[in-house]
């Protein structure tokens, strides 16, 4: 369980990098008013996969250590809720990807930006809670 905890904590910068790629490639297609290309689709898919795995590891960790958190449980639950919404934003992207036009690329970009903003908010919340 400790290994999962370390992996969950250390993956933050990888998540930021993948989110940036998941934003930049669709943004390029949006600015060119084109549908999403293969590279953009793969960037979104990889980010979706990694953030989903990260969320599942976090939920597993929350369930396994439920009684150990004490007063910090509130922050852990807020973090989990924010990350759930971020994962929800990412999983709404295929709905717009299937459109196959520039509007789908734009909406996918908006969802990726919203997801990154929520990930930053959730990570900041849990880091501030750990500091006291």
Residue spans for each PLM region:
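Polytopic transmembrane helical bundles with strong interfacial aromatic enrichment
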Residues: 1-132
């Amino acid at each position: 369980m400790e290994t999962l905890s370390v992996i969950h904590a250390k993956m933050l910068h990888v998540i930021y990098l993948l989110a940036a790629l998941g934003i930049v490639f669709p943004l390029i297609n949006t600015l060119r008013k084109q549908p999403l290309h293969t590279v953009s689709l793969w960037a979104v898919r990889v980010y979706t996969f990694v953030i989903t795995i990260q969320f599942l590891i976090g939920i597993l960790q929350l369930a396994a250590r439920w009684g150990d958190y004490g007063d910090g449980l509130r922050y852990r639950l807020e973090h989990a809720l924010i990350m759930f919404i971020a994962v929800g934003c990412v999983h709404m992207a295929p709905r717009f990807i299937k459109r196959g036009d520039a509007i789908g690329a734009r909406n996918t970009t908006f969802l990726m930006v919203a997801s990154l903003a929520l990930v930053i908010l959730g990570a900041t919340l849990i880091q501030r809670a750990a500091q006291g």
